[in-house]
Amino acid sequence: MFAVSSRRVLPGFTLSLGTSLLFVCLILLLPLSALVMQLAQMSWAQYWEVINNPQVVAAYKVTLLSAFVASIFNGVFGLLMAWILTRYRFPGRTLLDALMDLPFALPTAVAGLTLASLFSVNGFYGEWLAKFDIKVTYTWLGIAVAMAFTSIPFVVRTVQPVLEELGPEYEEAAETLGATRWQSFCKVVLPELSPALVAGVALSFTRSLGEFGAVIFIAGNIAWKTEVTSLMIFVRLQEFDYPAASAIASVILAASLILLFSINTLQSRFGRRVVGH
């Protein structure tokens, strides 16, 4: 037996738990079970043949490379934006804070069309980058740009609350003891931010793995070059090859779950270490 706290916001523990479990079953477990059922139609040899297909492997490489570059960029830029929004007061700060959520509200197709227009050869950014012989559209770099744009809020919104709770007092105390601003950031602030920053980058990476709408507009679907796994899955579905689509999706799903589980484990160990101190 276990005791349930009497201070409840929602009426009824049984009703709340039942509703939550129903949501988990309908939204998470049923789709995953459908994926498993599709995979069950394939033998191990057929499954291996699908995921080891050279074109599929090329799509995995493009997807992982682009998602990695996008998540690293988001880690740096997202930390910078979170720092600016929490440590400084300036005109337009509220607007800038609201704009950080724009990728969440903007349809990915609209985001992709906008990015394609900006980075095209005649676009605002593309024309300038062309002077340095840098092409973004219909390259893996364009995929990374689309992924970074759609997933940047994960880093900002994960790091920002931690920075607000941390406050500038710790930095000021370190500086009064003789530390430079860079030393106070690296030795005082960054260790406290690391769990949130790593979690934000991991969420950005896993979100990027499944990006579809923005990618297809800025990078197209060029086999061996800009074909990512989400586009390949879409093509397989159009061909009514559901087992093959499920097999390709299962690899990305496994990678995402392993990454998220690893991050949660590291955060849990970090939390126990902090409590132990």
What are these regions (language model features)?
Residues 8-43, 52-164, 188-213, 217, ...:
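Membrane-water interface segments at the C-terminal ends of transmembrane alpha-helices
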Residues 267-277:
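Short cytosolic juxtamembrane segments of multi-pass membrane proteins
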Residues 1-7, 48:
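Membrane-topology segments of multi-pass transport proteins
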Residues 45-52, 223-237:
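Short hydrophobic, aromatic-rich alpha-helical segments embedded in or entering the lipid bilayer
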